[in-house]
Design a protein with these regions (language model features):
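Alpha-helical structural signal
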Residues: 17, 42-43, 68
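The alpha-helix within a helix-turn-helix
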Residues: 21, 32, 61
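Short alpha-helical DNA-recognition segment
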Residues: 25-44
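The DNA-recognition helices of helix-turn-helix-type DNA-binding domains
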Residues: 38, 49, 64, 75-78
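Short, basic-rich loop-to-helix N-cap that marks the start of a DNA-contacting helix
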Residues: 49-62
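Short, charged recognition helix plus adjacent turn
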Residues: 72-99
Length: 99
């Protein structure tokens, strides 16, 4: 198992692959067929090239028996981590405050 640096966020596709698919011996193709979505959709998620949408979260929830919110929280955490790495955020200054 890889050591994860502090503050690093794992893409939800990596969690899907290592914690759900691999233990069950599921391929991306098989999972896609079972979820009634395209194989590239699942493959791109597993490769970290695509985000988990609400629709995908609902399908994964129904299939694996966990909540859709679980998947969306993983995606949201990853998205915030990526956004926080954006150097241009430091140039944003506070605007007018409500009186």
């Amino acid at each position: 198992m890889k050591k994860i640096p502090f503050g690093y966020s794992i893409h939800p596709g990596e969690i899907l692959k290592t914690e759900f698919m691999e233990p069950l011996g599921l391929s991306s193709y098989r999972l896609a067929k079972d979820l009634h979505v395209s194989a590239p959709r699942v493959n791109d998620i597993v490769l970290g090239k695509r985000s988990i949408t609400a629709d995908t979260a609902m399908r994964l929830s129904a299939y694996f028996g966990c909540s859709a919110q679980f998947w969306l929280n993983l995606q949201n955490k990853h998205d915030i981590w990526l956004a926080a790495k954006d150097k241009s955020l430091s140039r944003v200054k506070p605007g007018a405050q409500a009186a």
